[in-house]
Amino acid sequence: MLRNYLKVAFKVFLRRKFFTFISLFGIALTLIVLVVAVSLWDHVFGPHPPETRADRVLTVYFINAIGPAGNHTFGPAGYAFLDRYTRPLKTPESVSLHSVFLPTVSYRNGVKIKTWLKNVDAEFWRVFEFNFLEGGPFTKEDEKNASRVAVINETTSRRFFGGASAIGKTIELDRQNFRVVGVVSDVPMLRFTSFSDAWTPISSRRSQMYKREFENGMFFSTLLAKSRADIPKIHEEFRGMLARIEYPDPKLYNKIVARPNTLLDAVSDELFMGGLKTAVLVAIVLFLCLPTINLININVSRIRERASEIGVRKAFGADSGTLVLQFVIENVLLTVIGGLLAFVGCHLVLWLINATGWIPYAHLALNLRIFLYGLILAVFFGLLSGVYPAWKMSQLHPVQALRGGEL
C-alpha cells in the first residue's frame, strides 16, 4: 500500500515540475538560512576559545556620558575612566583593560601586510583562554616596563616568518618593533571581545595620551566573575563606583550610564531595548511562517488541479481518509527531499564562507541538532500546509469534484 502511495507521489512530482521546484526551493532555502544564521549566532555568542567562560565574563563595552545641557556622547570608554572605576572592583576574580582592535600596516620584504592590533594588559591572558602554540603571554612585569613584546596568531606568524618559529623574532606593528613572545591559534573576527592578529601591552603604545582619556576612548574593561552567582554583586559594586565618579569637567559631562554585560546582553540592550532573544524568536517564527503560507497556497492550487482525479477515485470507492493520506505522504516526502537538498546546501554555503575568508578565521560548522529541529518544523509545517486543503477536497461529492469544485 505504502509503495503505491510513493509511486503516485513521484509521478505527481514529475508531472507538476514547477510546483515541485517551488516547494523544494522554499523548504531548502528556509532550512539553509536558518542553519547558517544559527551557526553565525553560535560563533558570536557561544562558549568557544578563547571566550570559553562566556557565562561569567562581563564587559563594559560602551558608556553614555550625559551633560547638564542634554548633550551626550556614546561609545567605548577612555582608559582613565576604566582604570579608576573598574580595575579596583573587588568582587570579580580578574579585571582586564584592553583596546578595540584597530588595523595597522606593516611591510615585510617590500610586501604590505595589514594586521589587526589590540593593546591589552597582563590580566587579559587570565580572563581569556587562548591556545598557545608557541611561547606564552607577556607578564605584568612586561606591562610595567612598557616592554615591546607581542603575542601573534598563527596566520600572522606564517605571513611574517613562514614556517619557522616566531619566538624571539622581531615584528613591526604600528611603526614600532616588537619581540614575539607567544603564538596563539587564530581567533575568529566574530569573537568581538578577544579578536586580533597581534596583542601588545597597553603601556607600549607610541603615545601616552590614552592615560588621560575619560569619557571618550577606545577601551573596554572585561570582568571575570568567580561564579554566575557573583554577577549581581558585580553589578551592585559597579553602580556604587559610578555614584562616586569625579568628573574632569562637570560642565561638559556630569553623568555616566554604563553597565558590565555579556556581549549578548550588550547587543540586546543597545539595539533591541533588552529584547534581543524575543526579537530573534519572533524573527524565526515569521521566517518559518512565510514559507508555510507559500506552501499552503501552492498546495491549494495543486490540489485544485487534481480535483478531477479526486472525483474519479471517489467514484470508484476511495474514502476520504485514503485521499488525505495520499496528500500527507506527498507533502512529507517533498519535505524530506527538500531537507536532503538543504543538508547539501548548508555544507556548501558554510564551506564558501570559510573558504572565501569573508569572516576572518571563521570556521563555521553545521549544527546537526539545529538542522534536525528545523527539519522537524519543516515536516510539521508541510503537514499543516497539506492536510487541511486535502481534507476539504476529499469531502467533496464526486460529481462536484469532477466539475472542479472549490475548497
Q: Can you describe what each PLM-predicted range is?
A:
Residues 37-105, 215-220:
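Membrane-proximal extracellular/periplasmic loop immediately following the first transmembrane helix
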Residues 3-4, 11, 15, 243-283, ...:
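Membrane-helix entry/capping segments
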Residues 123-137, 148-271:
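Mid-to-C-terminal secondary-structure elements
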Residues 282-310, 389:
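A hydrophobic alpha-helix feature that marks transmembrane segments and, especially
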Residues 16-45:
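Short, strongly hydrophobic transmembrane alpha-helices
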Residues 61-62, 77-137, 251-255:
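Short amphipathic beta-strand/extended segments in non-transmembrane regions
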Residues 390-407:
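Short cytosolic juxtamembrane segments of multi-pass membrane proteins
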Residues 18-29, 293, 308-354, 369, ...:
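Transmembrane alpha-helical interface segments in multi-pass membrane proteins
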